[in-house]
């Protein structure tokens, strides 16, 4: 049983508090099984640990039994040394950006080790080959380079913070143009507060918001998003509202192109928004890669 970082998301189904959500997540821990957990809030970790003990299940937590030993930026991603349940694995090339993706890699590694009993290391060549082939469409996915356009499907405050940290580390831009659309059941205020903290309060880069919506019936109207963004502390002078996503993308890209290599466009806030953006900005077939081939509808079903 593998548990990723638990945050406040899907509260309509899982509960309104971390404790309630953690209790739901703990339901996947099977008798005499094996719990592999990411680093968690102490309250969440306690619930998971108590459940594992009641189920007589083995358990391992990131940062205790396994984790990232060393992490360095690399072209197209990062270079990792991971500590698993049964060994250490240096010089792993992971073609994904962000500290959180390194942590996800350690979680995946420990899960596979646990599947094989957790008492022997995996073959190094298999580990290297496996991570080298990792793709995560819609997660800091660069679909254009002139201007830079990056899609990220983060749709809750926790995810937006992780993606923002990784985006700033990977691309080091002085001008960020963010095209944002959010679905109605999500914590829009929390998302905007994180965006303000990450791009306005803690960086010298200029930042602009282009608020729009996908075609989903669940999408928050752009005008309502503007009010929420203002409540989150954004200056109205850096906000523009667009009824149609294609217009928001076109203007953001035009502005980024004018600022050349120091600028980029980030599309985020909802899987439906980045799915539609991918369709609108689809590259010619000869330029496509395996990372860009997932259908927007499949992404939306899987992640929202």
Where are the regions a protein language model picked out?
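Active-site-proximal loop/hinge segments that shape catalytic or ion-binding/gating pockets
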Residues: 270
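Short, surface-exposed connector motifs at secondary-structure boundaries
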Residues: 27-35, 170-176, 205-208, 235, ...
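Nucleotide phosphate-binding/pyrophosphate-handling subdomain across enzymes
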Residues: 1-2, 6-7, 11, 20, ...
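Short, flexible loop segments at boundaries between secondary-structure elements
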Residues: 214-218, 287-304
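C-terminal helical cap/extension that packs against the catalytic core
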Residues: 41-56, 148-150, 157, 190-263
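Beta-strand->loop->alpha-helix junctions that form or flank phosphate-binding loops
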Residues: 38-39, 53-73, 94-99, 126-133, ...
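Acidic, Mg2+-coordinating active-site environments of NTP-dependent enzymes
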Residues: 3-91, 105-125
């Amino acid at each position: 049983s593998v548990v990723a970082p638990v945050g406040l998301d899907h509260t309509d189904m899982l509960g309104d508090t971390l404790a309630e959500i953690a209790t739901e997540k703990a339901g996947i821990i099977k008798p005499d099984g094996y719990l592999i957990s990411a680093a968690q809030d102490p309250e969440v970790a306690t619930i998971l640990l108590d459940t594992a003990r009641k189920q007589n299940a083995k358990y391992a937590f990131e940062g205790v039994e396994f984790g990232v030993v060393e992490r360095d930026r690399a072209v197209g991603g990062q270079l990792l040394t991971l500590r698993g349940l049964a060994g250490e694995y240096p010089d792993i090339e992971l073609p994904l950006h962000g500290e959180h993706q390194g942590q996800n890699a350690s979680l995946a590694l420990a899960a596979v080790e646990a599947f094989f009993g957790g008492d022997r290391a995996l073959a190094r060549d298999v580990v290297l080959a496996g991570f080298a082939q990792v793709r995560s469409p819609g997660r800091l996915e660069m679909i254009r380079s002139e201007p830079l356009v990056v899609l990220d499907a983060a749709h809750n405050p926790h995810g937006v913070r992780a993606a923002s940290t990784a985006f700033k580390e990977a691309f080091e831009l002085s001008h960020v143009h963010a095209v944002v659309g959010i679905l109605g059941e999500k914590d829009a205020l929390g998302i905007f507060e994180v965006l303000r903290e990450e791009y306005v309060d803690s960086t010298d880069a200029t930042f602009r918001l282009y608020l729009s919506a996908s075609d989903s019936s669940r999408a928050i109207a752009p005008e309502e998003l503007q009010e929420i963004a203002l409540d989150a502390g954004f200056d109205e002078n850096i906000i523009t509202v667009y009824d149609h996503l294609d217009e928001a993308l076109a203007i953001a890209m035009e502005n980024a192109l004018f600022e050349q290599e120091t600028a980029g466009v980030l599309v985020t806030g909802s899987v439906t928004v980045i799915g539609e953006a991918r369709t609108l900005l689809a590259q010619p077939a000869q330029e496509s890669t395996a990372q860009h081939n997932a259908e927007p509808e499949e992404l939306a079903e899987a992640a929202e």
